[in-house]
Amino acid sequence: MNTPINYSEKFGQTLQEIDHAVATKIESMTSTPFESSTAKLFAVDYVRGEVPAIRLIAEHADIYEMLDDTLNAVLLFDSGYNGFAVVTTGWAAPIDKDNDDNNEVAPSQHPERRRVRLMTMMHNGKMGSSIRFTDEESVTYDEGNAMGSLASAMQDLYDVVRALKVSSTKQNERQLP
């Protein structure tokens, strides 16, 4: 009897393999992988069982401007890759549920601050992310529960790249005899 495919498990594996490849790429690019003044956009090509191909497309000080740049959508489309990922770094600090005043302190000024690196990816229409801390070996994964402005900007870029693919396909069909 065949075991049914668990798509969430498959996506979890995809997320982890792409995250590992992106982390390896970042770590090969710099000696300070948790301290970058720019967000990075990567094209990602992945087929299960293969090593993901990762290519740097753009860097920008403002992740939202980078994701909103139509040229980056064209570069992703031209890459022919089936996904993309963004990486950004910063500070994280614990949230004090009992004392809202402590939550007013910027993470970079908080006494318990930690350096963090966030990788968020879109692959075949699904979004996932990973969070890594400098002082921790383990990685925290989120398989599709992303919400907020970054998730919206990622979805918008994905939609533009898809529209380019659809437009290109229709253009090629019109040229056939």
Each predicted region: which residue ranges?
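Extracellular/luminal recognition modules and glycoprotein regions
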Residues: 8-26
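Catalytic cores of nucleic-acid ligases and guanylyltransferases
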Residues: 1, 50, 177
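Short HxH-centered metal-ligating active-site micro-motif
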Residues: 65-104
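Compact, glycine/acidic-enriched structural inserts
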Residues: 2-9, 58-59, 75, 139-153
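Glycine-rich, aromatic-bearing surface loops/beta-hairpins
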Residues: 99-177
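Short, surface-exposed beta-edge/turn micro-motifs
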Residues: 37-42, 81-83, 114-118
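Eukaryotic short linear interaction motifs
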Residues: 50-52, 95, 128
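N-terminal interaction modules that seed assembly of large macromolecular complexes
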Residues: 20-68
